[in-house]
C-alpha cells in the first residue's frame, strides 16, 4: 500500500481483532445436562472475581440508559477506570442483554486501536445490571471543548491533529468491516495525554452484504447524511465520513453545521439543501429513486468559493477536504482511506503535537455524561448548542435488530 500523506506514514493496517472470550475446549461434551449447573457456577465465580477487582468511586454521570462511575483497581489505586453500569430495560428482561450493549461489547472487544476507547472487562451484578469496565478518559469530550469559547481557543493545527486522530480511528473501523454510525463531538473523548478516543459503539454494525438491507433510521440527526434521510437501505462507510465532515465543520466554526430546529427529517433535508445544495439527478444519479426522496426547493450546489467564505480559517486544502467529505452523492464522497490520503494533512500548519493540544474538555464528569447516553441522542443539556434542556428523546431510534442491522 502506498504511503499516506497523513504525517508521511501509511494508513495503519488493520490490527488483528482481539479474541477476548475463550472458546470452550473441543473435547467438552455438552450432551450431558448435568454439566450445565457446573458451567453456570463457574461463570458466576469468574464474574464475581472480575467484579471484585474494582472499587467504585464517585458517580460521573447518570441517565435513563446507564450510570457511569469512576473506579480503581484494588491491586493498584493509581489505575483508574470508568465503569458504565447499563440499567435493566425491557429488552434486557426479554433477551438478557440490551441491543446497544451487545453491539458495544462485540465491537470494542474486536477493535484495538490507540484512538478507540478500550474495553477492559465486562461483568454483571445480581440485579442483572451489565457493567462495562472502560478506559478512564479524564479530559472530557470534544463537544465541551468546542463550546467553551470563553476560556479555550484553538488553532487550525489543533483541528488538524484532532481530525487526524478521528480519521485514523474511522479508517481502522472500516478496514475491519465495522460502521460506527454515531460519530459526533460528544462521542470523541479526550485522554489525559490529549489523544482523541472514539467511543459509544452502541449503534455500530458490521458492513453488510451489498444485497442485505440495513436500517436508515440511525446516526444522531444533526450528523446524519442525506442518503439516510432519503431512506437508503444499502450503504457503507460513506455515512461515517459525512458525520466526520460535520465534526470537521463544527470544529472550524465552533457551531453545529446542520442544526435544524425543530429537529426533524424535513427540516434537516431543507438545511442540507441550503448549505450544500439540493440533491438532483445531475449531481447524484439515481437519488430520485430513493423512496424517501424529497426536494423542498432546487438550490444549486455551493461553489468552492462559497465554502471558502464560510471556512476560510482552515485554508484552501482544508476546505477542499471538507467539500469532498460532505459530497451529496455517497459514491463520490471520499472513503476513510481517501480522507487520510488528502494533501491537507501534510500542508502547513502541521498537526499539533499531543502535548500542545488544549485538553480541558469538561473533565471526568463530562466523560461520564457522554458515556451515560444511548446512541443517537443529542446532548441532553438544552439549547441548540447543547447547553440546556434535553431534546435527545426526540431523536428517532427505531433500531431494527434483525441481523444486527
How would you label these PLM feature ranges?
Residues 278-323:
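C-terminal lobe substrate-recognition/regulatory segment of protein kinase catalytic domains
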Residues 56-64, 68:
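Protein kinase glycine-rich loop
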Residues 128-141:
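Conserved short submotifs of the Hanks-type protein kinase catalytic core
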Residues 162-163:
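Activation segment signature within eukaryotic-like protein kinase domains
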Residues 350-405:
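C-terminal intrinsically disordered, low-complexity extensions immediately downstream
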